[in-house]
Amino acid sequence: MTRLDVEKTIEELTLGEKVALTAGIDFWHTASVPRLNIPTLRMSDGPNGVRGTRFFNGVPAACFPCATALGATWDTELLHECGRLMGEESIAKGSHIILGPTINTQRSPLGGRGFESFAEDGVLSGNLAGYMSKGIQEKGVAATLKHFVCNDQEHERLAVDSIVTMRAMREIYLMPFQLAMRICPTACVMTAYNKVNGTHVSENKQIITDILRKEWGWDGLVMSDWFGTYSTSEAINAGLDLEMPGKTRWRSTPLAHAVSSNKVAEFVMDERVRNVLNLVNFVEPLGIPENCPEKALNRPQDQALLRRAAAESIVLMKNDDNILPLKKDKPILVIGPNAKIAAYCGGGSASLDPYYTVTPFEGVSAKSTGAVTFSQGVYSHKQLPELGPLMKSADGKKGFSFRVYKEPVSAPSRELVDELHLVSSSGFLMDYVHPKIDSLTFYVDMEGYFTPEEDGVYDFGVTVVGTGKLLIDGETVVDNTKNQRPGSAFFGTATVEEQGSKELKAGQTYKVVLEFGTAPTSDLDTRGVVVFGPGGFRFGASRRVSQEELIAKAADAAAQAEQVVIFAGLTSEWETEGHDRDHMDLPPGSDEMIQRVLAANPNTAVVIQSGTPVTMPWAAQTKALVQAWFGGNECGNGIADVLYGDVNPAGKLPLSFPVRLQDNPSYLNFRSERGRVLYGEDVYVGYRYYEKVNLAPLFPFGHGLSYTTFERSDLTLATVPEKPQYETAGEPITASVTVTNTGPVAGAEVVQLWVRPPPTGVNRPVRELKGFAKVMLNPGEQKRVDIVVEKKLATSWWDEQREMWASEKGQYEVQVTGTGADVLTSSFAVEKTRFWLGL
C-alpha cells in the first residue's frame, strides 16, 4: 500500500471511480482503483473476536467473552489489552477494519443482541468501548463503533421507527458513543438499521452530520450496516460515506445520475470519497496486501489473556455460608445442560469458529483432584443438537461429506462441482463461492454415517434457508421442502426446525443424507428480512428421553453428594441476532431441575450462563449463585478458576437483573407495533428506573460479591475554580478514597462514583454513575484510589428547549460505593448555570 495524497487523488478520479469507492464490492471488501494506487480494504466482524471473511468453513479465531461479560469486569486496562489482541487477530486475518465494538443500550432483557453491548449505562459502556477501541487502533487497525443509534431490538429492525425524546437520545443512547469518542476517536462508525423519529439513521443528517461530525468534531468514515442503506441521494447527502456490502444496490448508476443532475452536489460527493481515502491512509502503515490469506494465531499468551478475561467477568451474586470456593480435594457432582457444552458466544454476526473451547465440565475436571461425576438433569437445546460431530464420513473421519451440484437430485445426470469435508452440521452459506457456481441456485448432498450408542427413538430436525430433506438409509425422515414455516435462525431468514423420528439400534451404522437446495428453491415468505446469499442449513438429532427421569436422577445424585454445582442458562440458540427473546425464562425444565436439586442438596452452587438477565424463581432458595455469561474460548477454565478460588471473583453487574420481565421499564413498549416502538421510559433505563420508583430488582446494577472484604474510607473531593467565561470548560473533580482489603485473600475492588443532583428544572434520576476505578489489593493492603470526572459531564442534562446541555447551579452529592452496602458521601457545587455543546 502507498500513502495517498488525498486531495490530488480526488482531482484525478473520474466520477465513475468516485461512485465505485462509496460502496463495497462484496461482503467484506471496499473497491479499489489500481491506476491511482487505491487498494481494496478488508473488514471483519466483530464485537467479540475477528472472524475473518467467511461465515462458512472459515479460519478459526480467538473468541473473547461477550460484551456484557467484559462489561462486568469494569476494567478499562483489561479492555485495552483485549483491544490490542483483537488488532493482532485482525492483522492475522488480513483485515484492516474491525466491525466493533458494539455500544447500544439494553432497554430490555429481551434484546436478541443485548449480549453484544457492554452495559445499560453510558458511562460504563462508553469508557470500556473507548479503551477497547484504543487498543485496536494502537495496532493500526480501524475500529468501528456501532450501531449508531437506537438499534436496541431485533424485531423489524430494518423498518422499525424508534420514537425517542431528544433528551433520552442524548443522555442514554448517544452517551456511550460520545464518551468512547473522547477516549479514542474511532476510524469508523456504523449506522443502525432502524429509523429514529421518522428517518432511517443511514439517511439522517441530524445524527450523522450535525451531531457526529459538526458537534463532536469527528472526521472518520461512516458506513452502513449490512443492507442498511435505503436511498441514494438522501444517504449521500446525510453523510453516509460507504454502502455495505457489495454489490451495491444504491450507488453505481443511480448515484452517478444523482451527481450529474445536482441531486448530490459534487463537493458532497468529494467529501464522501475523501473519508474513504482518509481511511485508506489510516490503515496504510499495516502493510496488509490485498486479498491477504487468513491465518490463525492462538498463542499461549493470547490463551492466558482470554482465560483472565473469562474469570474477571464472572459475578458472584450470592455466597451464603461461604459455599464457595469449592474444595479441590473433595469429590464433586456436576449437573446441568450447560456443563458439557461450551456456551462461548451469542448468535449472529458476533459468532465465530473458535480455535478451541473449554466446557465447564472440562474446566472443573482439570481443577479437581477428587472424583468428578456428571448428571444431565435436563436438556436445554432450542433446536436438536448438531448431528455432524457424531457422524463419520465414508473414509472414517469425524463429520460428513458436502457435495455441491448445479442440478437437483432429481436430474437424470449431474456433475459434481465441489466437495468439502465438514464437521459442523450448521452452515451459513452467505460467503460460499466457487468459480463454477454462477447462480444463487445450486444443490448440496451432505452424506455421512451415524452409529448410535443407545437403543431408542431418535428425533431428527432440519432447519433451512432453502429446502432440505433428511434421509436415513434411504427413508425420508424429515421433509422441509414444502409448506415451510418461518423461524428465527440465520438472522430470522430460516424455517422453523421441522422434525421427524426413527427408532435406532445401538451399534448399528446408519447412512444419513441431507438433500439441500439453496434459498431460491424455497417458497418461504421472507418479506421484512434480508436473505444473505445462497442460504443456510442445520440438521440435528437427539435420543428421546424422559425429562422427569433426568431430573429425578440428578436430584437423587445431589442428595448423596458432598459438593454439587449446576450449570444452566442460555446458548447462542436462545440469544441471537435477528430475533428477540419472547421471555426472560430459562429453557423449559431448567427451573424445575434447579429447584429439585436445591431441595435435595441446599448447598448446591448454581452457575448461570447467559448474555442478559434471566428469571430466577429459585434465587432465594440457593446459597451460592454465579453469573458466568458467554465466556469465550476459555469459558470453562475461567469458571473453574473462580469456583475453586484460584481467582477471586471481582465482576460487577453491568445490567440490572429484574425479578420478572414486567418490572422492566420497557415492558409495555419493547416490540415494534405498526412499524414503530415508543421509548416510553425516556431517560429511566435500567437502574435509573428502579431507583426512581423504589422498586428493588433481583440483583442491582453494580452488584457483585467477593471471597474477601473491603473497606472504603477517607473520601475527599478536589475541585478547581469554574471558568464561567468558557461555556464548555471541563473543570476536573478528583474524588480520592482509601480502599483496604480487610479479608483473608487477595482481590480486586471496583470503586463506583455516583452523582446525585439537587432539585433542577426537570425530573432527573435519583443518581447516575459518573466514574469508576478498579484496584487490586493483597490481604491487609490499602491504596488511595483517584477517580477524575469533568464537572460539566457529571452534572448536565439535555435541555430540549435550548437544544443544549444544561449544568445547573446547585449542590451535588457524590456517593462512592463498591462491594457491600456502605456508601461514602461528599458534595461539590456548581456555582453558575451553564449551557454547552460539544464532545
Swiss-Prot record:
Q: Which UniProt keywords apply?
A: Carbohydrate metabolism, Cellulose degradation, Glycoprotein, Glycosidase, Hydrolase, Polysaccharide degradation, Secreted
PA14 domain spans which residues? 395-555
* Keyword Lipid metabolism attached: no
Which superkingdom does the taxonomy of this entry point to? Eukaryota
Job description of the protein: Beta-glucosidases are one of a number of cellulolytic enzymes involved in the degradation of cellulosic biomass. Catalyzes the last step releasing glucose from the inhibitory cellobiose.
Q: Which GO terms describe its biological process?
A: cellulose catabolic process
Quote the cellular component terms of the Gene Ontology held in the record. Answer: extracellular region
Which residues, renumbered to this chain, are glycosylated? 197
- Protein name, per record: Probable beta-glucosidase I
The enzyme class is hydrolase
Similarity field: Belongs to the glycosyl hydrolase 3 family.
Its EC number(s): 3.2.1.21
Catalytic site: 225
Source organism per entry reads Aspergillus terreus (strain NIH 2624 / FGSC A1156)
InterPro entries, alphabetized: Cellulose_deg_GH3 (IPR050288), Fn3-like (IPR026891), Glyco_hydro_3_AS (IPR019800), Glyco_hydro_3_C (IPR002772), Glyco_hydro_3_C_sf (IPR036881), Glyco_hydro_3_N (IPR001764), Glyco_hydro_3_N_sf (IPR036962), Glycoside_hydrolase_SF (IPR017853)
> Which transformation does this protein catalyse, written as a reaction?
Hydrolysis of terminal, non-reducing beta-D-glucosyl residues with release of beta-D-glucose
